[in-house]
Amino acid sequence: MNDLNPQASEYFPYPTVRPHQDQFISAISEAIEARKSVLVEGSNGLGKTIAALSACLPKAIDENLKILYVARTHRQHERVIEELKAIFKRQPVSGIAIRGRHEMCLNDLLIQHPLDTRAIMEICELLKSRGRCKYYRKIEERQREYSELQRQISTRPCTASELQTVCRRTGFCPYELSKSALPDVRVIALSYLYVFDPVIRTAFLSNLETPLSRIILIVDEAHNLPETAVNIASTKLSLFVIKQSENEAKKFKHKDVAAFAKTIRAEIEENVARMSKQELVSPDFLLKLVQEKAGVADPLDFFEHLHDTGVLIKKSLLADGKFPRSYIYTMGYFMLKWHETANDQAYINVVSKYVSKEGIPSARLEIVALDPSKTTMPVFSQVYASVIMSGTLQPMDAYIRITGLQEDTVRNVLPSPFPKEHILPLISCGVTTAMEKRTPEMYRKITRKLKEIVVNTPANTGIFTPSFQVLNALLESGLKNALNKPLFCEHRNMTSRENERMVAEYKEHSTQTGAVLLGVQGGRSSEGVDFPGDEMNSVAIVGLPYAEPTPKVKAQIEYFDERFPGFGREYGYVLPAMKKASQAAGRPIRTPDDKGAMIFLDHRFSSAYCRSFLPAWIQEDLEIVEDEDGAIAHKLNGFFRRVC
C-alpha cells in the first residue's frame, strides 16, 4: 500500500496493488487536482475500475463533487458498484447503478413495446402525469415507507438489479426510486446516453440537482465514445413510419397530415427507385418535396404542426387506456431535425435502401452526424475534471482532436501488466480480406489456416471476421466441416439474450475438448465480453474491418480531411477499423494470469502503418509468420507447451 498516495490509499480496498496500478492512480489524482482531463490507455488486468474510483473519491468527498462513471454495458455498471462495496468496508461511500427507464420499468404498458430512449422518456412522463402508472402512484400512497427505502438506497452502494428486486417486492417504481436517491448519492454508474445525449442529460442533471461543473466524469471503454456520439446526434425516418403516419392521420381525422404523408411517401418511393443502395442528398431534397409536391408554404411551421399533432394523439390514446405511441410525432421530430441541421456542415442527409427483418425491401431518410465533438465537447468543457480510459486510445492526439478535448489534456500510456511469456502475437502473411482479393480460393486458404489454429489450440478458439459477408463466405468455403471442435456462430439478427446464451454454451466447452466462437469484429462478442483462462486460448483476427466505402463513409473522410488536413482517411476510416481489430485481439488476455495467442490473418497487419495503431503490449513482441503450411502450428505448439 506504500506505493499509493495517502489520500487514494484510504479508498483502495485491497491488500496489494497490481503492477502499474499505482501509476494509474497517480496520473488520475494529479489531473483531477489540476482540474484537467486525463486520457489513460491501459490494458485489462490493470484494475482500471478500482484505480479510477480510488483516485477520484478523495477529491469528490473533499469538494462535495459527484462522480459519474459512464460505461456501455450493464455488466460494467454492476462492476463499479461491486468495487464500491469493497470500498464501503473501509470508508462510508454511496453509489448506485442506473439503467434506462425501459430496462427498469415494471409497467406492462411500457415494457411490451420496443421504443427508443427519448420516446420512452416522453411516454413515461405522460403516464405519470395522467395517473396511469400504479408503481408511481404507490409513492404517494405509501410515502413514509418510500422515504425510508430511499434513505437506505442513498447511504450505501446498490446495483440496479438489487434495486429492481426491492421494487418488485414493494411495488414502487425502480426508476423513480433511483432518481429520488440521486441527489444524495456520491457515485452513479450509468450509460453514455445520460451524459452525452443533450435532451436526456438536461433531465438527468435536473434530477441529480448538480451542474456539470460539480461532476468528475469517468468514461470507461472510451474508444467507443466517438461512434456513440455521432449515433446520438443522428436520426432516421423509414417509409414504414411515414406510411403508419398516414394511417394514423386518417384514423384521427387529420386530413392535412394524411395528405402530406401520402405525398411524401409516394415521392420518396419514386426517387428511391432510381437510386443506388445509398445516396447523399441535399437538404433541399426534402424541403422542395414538402413545398412543391405537398403544397406546404412554410415547412418549419408545418413540421411544428406535425409535432404538436403527435402530442395530442399520444394524450388521446392514453386517455383511452391505450399505448401512447404516435408515428406522426416521430415524423414531426425527424422533419424538425432535418430543418434544424439543413445548413450545418457537420451533418449530411442520406437516402438508403435496406431489407427489413421480415425480408421486405424498404428505404429510409437519414440525418447523419459527422462530428463527434459537437456532442462530446459541451460535456468535457464543463465538467470539473474527466478521466477517459480504454485499452485502445492511441494515437491520443487524434482522439483529443476528434472528441474536442482541451489541448492540455494529460496523456498517459501504462505498461502492460501481462508477462511477455504469456502472450503470443502473430501475423500470418499470404492471406487477406481486401475486397479485390475475396475469391473462393482465398477463402479456402483462410479456412486452412483457421483449421491449423483450432487444431493446435488446447481448448477454446475465437475467430472474428471484418463483416458478416466474410463470415458467411468462410462458412460456404467449408469452415464448419474443417474444424474438429463444435462451432458457435454469431448471426446478424441475433438478440442480446440469444448471444449471451450462445457465448455461455461456448464457454462451457472450455473444460471439455474445446469449441470455436465465430463472430464479427466490432460485434457483441468481440467487445465487452471477457474470455479468461481456457475460455479463449487463441483468437484469430481475420482481415481488417474497414467500413464499406459508402457515401456516408466517404463523407466522413472528407469532413475530417477538411477539419484536419491530411488526416481524413486516418481518422474516419483507418482508426475505427484498427480499434475494432485491437479490441477483438485482446479477448483471450483479460488478467495477468491468462495465456493466449492472437493471430492476425491478413498481410496488411504487417505494414508499419497498420502495426502502429495496435496497442503497445501487442506490438512489442509481434512476430510475422511466413506463408507456409505448418508455420502457425509450429508456433502455437511451442507456445502452449511452454505456458500450459
Locate predicted features:
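Walker A/P-loop
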Residues: 34-52
